[in-house]
Structures are given as structure tokens and as C-alpha cells.
From Swiss-Prot:
The chain crosses the membrane at residues 46-71, 82-103, 119-140, 163-182, 207-232, 267-288, 303-325. This is Somatostatin receptor type 3. Disulfide bonds join C117-C192. The modification Phosphoserine is found at S341, S346, S351. Homodimer and heterodimer with SSTR2. Heterodimerization with SSTR2 inactivates SSTR3 receptor function. One of its GO terms (molecular function) is signaling receptor binding. Belongs to the G-protein coupled receptor 1 family. Phosphorylated. Phosphorylation increases upon somatostatin binding. InterPro entries: GPCR_Rhodpsn, GPCR_Rhodpsn_7TM, Somatstn_rcpt, Somatstn_rcpt_3.
């Protein structure tokens, strides 16, 4: 896994039978002792380090914007916003491992010590698994929202999403425990590696299968199943003439809600597809390297670099997807990035707000509808508590004095007094 390896661009004397990790370059690089080759490797190591640093800066800025938008410009975050916040936080922390990787590539050795090696690798592993687990939970949430919108309404709330997100972080920390135990800088070596006990080859193979199953293929199976069921549901719904839960009078509101759900689903699908595109080469190359060891020649350094760089590029590209596919994030980015120019334009004569597209109007309408639903839910909970108070007051045989507040007394049924009864009889 890319989060637990820090390959060097220089040849090493590492014995693959004693210390190995899941990155293919954690083996001896063969007989590449020519001066020209060593010079080329040193230059490529510096260039690769610069690329890593650029990706790190862009990723930190982009994910910081996402976190700021969710926390600052979202008064009542939705379920999807909670999961995106945790995904952005994982991507942000994932970016912090790039400077260490860049330093090892530029210096051709790990200068930070064994303890820092273990810490950095463990943190990267936690954030890698948190990313895929968050995407899996988001896909399950999309399945519930589209296939079971009514039954899942009580569970698809922001507090439940926060609890699930906390469980995701805990599960990721448990999964990477082998990294904490076996990572470090081997004796006589200057690179950060996984140090397996004997038989090292068996341990290494088991770890690759373990990380690939839990960190990619298992979650990918769940994600594909969720979207397969979503496609089946959408196709069956389009064949119906009328939606059973939507009357013709409410058709515009129902259509807006469906369009909003489709946009959210499209954004989640795009994020998942990008994750698969960036991570699948890495896991496939690791599995191929177990079955048939790959050549350890400088000619393959470009392939190895691409395989390790793609996962970091994925964390860097997620904020760009949010900006293109989500109106809420687009508006949040505009407020932050275009705030000075907006003040200047607002002072110009005849300047006005930009025209909104149909999708933007739908999303604003959906936000208002969600806020109204939350207010109605709070009102129903209050009425439920008041009805329980009323039932408790009328359950006893002896009438009890009313001790509720004035607002509660107005909502409780009032019994007619004797004067009211007399006046009613006189009218009869």
C-alpha cells in the first residue's frame, strides 16, 4: 500500500527475504552500478520529490477549502456533507505524508528515524482506509436515499452520520495495527520499510491480500452492489406512469427532489470512480508482483512512480470534483475565493448577482425543503412530548392540577366550564 512505503530512487542492498512491504521497489534493484544510471536516478529522485511537493500543496489547499466550506457555510449539514467532511479530513492528513516521501526520494535515505517512520506510515494507512470506508458508507447512504427513502429517513440524519464516521475512523485504526507493529527502519538500512518475521515471504503475501481485500476489493464490491440496486430502482421507477408517493399536484416539488438526489448520486459516483481509477493500478501491481516478481530495473521507475503518485493525486482531485458537481461547494468556493472581486463588482453601477441555472435553483429549493422538514420534525417531537404529558394527566382517576407552561396549556384540550354549559343550553 502506498501509505506504508517510502521507496528510494537509489539502489539498495535490502534482502527481500528479511524486510519487505507491499511496494514493488522494496527489493534489491539489481546490478545498476553504472555512474550514469546513478546520476539519472538522483536527478529523477529530485524531480519526483518536486512533483510530490506540488501535489501536497494543492491537496492541502483544496481539502482545507472543503473543510472550511462545510464547517463555515453550512448551517445544518446534510448526511452527505458529514461524510464529505470526513473524507476531506482523511485526504488532508493523507497529504501530510508526501513531504516525508519527497525527502526520502531527494536524499536517498530516511532521515527521520524509526519512530517517525512508524508514525507516518500508520497515519497514512489510517487515512487511506478511512477514505475507502467513507466512500463505501456514502454509497450505502445513496442506496438508502434512492431505494428506501421513507424507511431510511429516521436513520439518514446528521447525528447518525457523525456516529458512523467516528466508527469508520476507529475501524481504520484497527485495520492498520500490523503497520504499527512491523514498520520501521531495518538495521544496516536507511529506508522506511515493513519488517516481517520469518517466513517473510508468507507474511508479505498475507499482508498484501489483507490490505487489498479490506482496503479496496471488499469495499468496491459493496459499492458496486449499491449502485447496481440503485440502477434497478431507477429503471423500475421510470416505467411507472405515476409515482405512488407523489400526487400530480406535488409533481414539481417531487421532480426537484429527484433531480437533487440524482445530482448527489452523480457526485458520489464520480468520486468513487476516481478513487477506483487511481487506486486499482497500485493494488493490481502489488498482486502481480507477488505472483510474478517485477523487473528491478531503472526503466520501470516511471511505472512505479505513477503507481504511487496516483493515490495522492486522487486526494488532490476530490475538491475539484466537489466544485464542479455540487452547487453548495461551488457557492462556498466562490464566497471564499471571489470575495474581494465581488466587493468591487457590487460597487459598479448596474451590477447584479449572476443568473442562476435550473440546477442551482433546484438545490436552493432542496435546501429550503430540508430545513422545513427538520423544523417539522422538531415540531412533531414537541407535540409528541406534549401529548404524553396530556395522557399522563388524564390517566389518573383524580384530576390533577395543571402545571404545564402557558404554551402547553394552549395545546391541551380544555374542558367546558359550568358557565359555558349554561350559556350553551340557553342558546338551545
Amino acid at each position: 500500500m502506498a501509505t506504508v512505503t517510502y521507496p528510494s530512487s537509489e539502489p539498495t542492498t535490502l534482502d527481500p527475504g528479511n524486510a519487505s512491504s507491499t511496494w514493488p521497489l522494496d527489493t534489491t534493484l539489481g546490478n545498476t552500478s553504472a555512474g550514469a544510471s546513478l546520476t539519472g536516478l538522483a536527478v529523477s529522485g529530485i524531480l519526483i520529490s518536486l512533483v510530490y511537493l506540488v501535489v501536497c500543496v494543492v491537496g492541502l489547499l483544496g481539502n482545507s477549502l472543503v473543510i472550511y466550506v462545510v464547517l463555515r457555510h453550512t448551517s445544518s449539514p446534510s448526511v452527505t456533507s458529514v461524510y464529505i467532511l470526513n473524507l476531506a479530513l482523511a485526504d488532508e492528513l493523507f497529504m501530510l505524508g508526501l513531504p516525508f516521501l519527497a525527502a526520502q526520494n531527494a536524499l536517498s535515505y530516511w532521515p527521520f528515524g524509526s519512530l517517525m517512520c512508524r508514525l507516518v506510515m500508520a497515519v497514512d494507512g489510517i487515512n487511506q482506509f478511512t477514505s475507502i470506508f467513507c466512500l463505501t458508507v456514502m454509497s450505502v447512504d445513496r442506496y438508502l436515499a434512492v431505494v428506501h427513502p421513507t424507511r431510511s429517513a429516521r436513520w439518514r440524519t446528521a447525528p447518525v452520520a457523525r456516529t458512523v464516521s467516528a466508527a469508520v475512523w476507529v475501524a481504520s485504526a484497527v485495520v492498520v495495527l500490523p503497520v504499527v507493529v512491523f514498520s520501521g527502519v531495518p538495521r544496516g538500512m536507511s529506508t522506511c520499510h515493513m519488517q516481517w518475521p520469518e517466513p517473510a515471504a508468507a507474511w508479505r503475501t498475507a499482508f498484501i491480500i489483507y490490505t487489498a481485500a479490506l482496503g479496496f476489493f471488499g469495499p468496491l464490491l459493496v459499492i458496486c452492489l449499491c449502485y447496481l440496486l440503485i440502477v434497478v430502482k431507477v429503471r423500475s421507477t421510470t416505467r411507472r406512469v405515476r409515482a405512488p408517493s407523489c400526487q400530480w399536484v406535488q409533481a414539481p416539488a417531487c421532480q426537484r427532489r429527484r433531480r437533487s438526489e440524482r445530482r448527489v448520486t452523480r457526485m458520489v459516483v464520480a468520486v468513487v470512480a476516481l478513487f477506483v481509477l487511481c487506486w486499482m493500478p497500485f493494488y493490481l501491481l502489488n498482486i502481480v508482483n507477488v505472483v510474478c516478481p517485477l523487473p528491478e530495473e531503472p526503466a520501470f521507475f516511471g511505472l512505479y512512480f505513477l503507481v504511487v503518485a496516483l493515490p495522492y493525486a486522487n486526494s488532490c482531485a476530490n475538491p475539484i470534483l466537489y466544485g464542479f458537481l455540487s452547487y453548495r461547494f461551488k457557492q462556498g468556493f466562490r464566497r471564499i475565493l471571489l470575495r474581494p472581486s465581488r466587493r468591487i463588482r457590487s460597487q459598479e453601477p448596474g451590477s447584479g448577482p449572476p443568473e442562476k441555472t435550473e440546477e442551482e435553483e433546484d438545490e436552493e429549493e432542496e435546501e429550503r425543503r430540508e430545513e422545513e422538514e427538520r423544523r417539522m420534525q422538531r415540531g412533531q417531537e414537541m407535540n409528541g412530548r406534549l401529548s404524553q404529558i396530556a395522557q399522563a394527566g388524564t390517566s389518573g382517576q383524580q384530576p390533577r392540577p395543571c402545571t404545564g407552561t402557558a404554551k402547553e396549556q394552549q395545546l391541551l384540550p380544555q374542558e367546558a366550564t359550568a358557565g359555558d354549559k349554561a350559556s350553551t343550553l340557553s342558546h338551545l
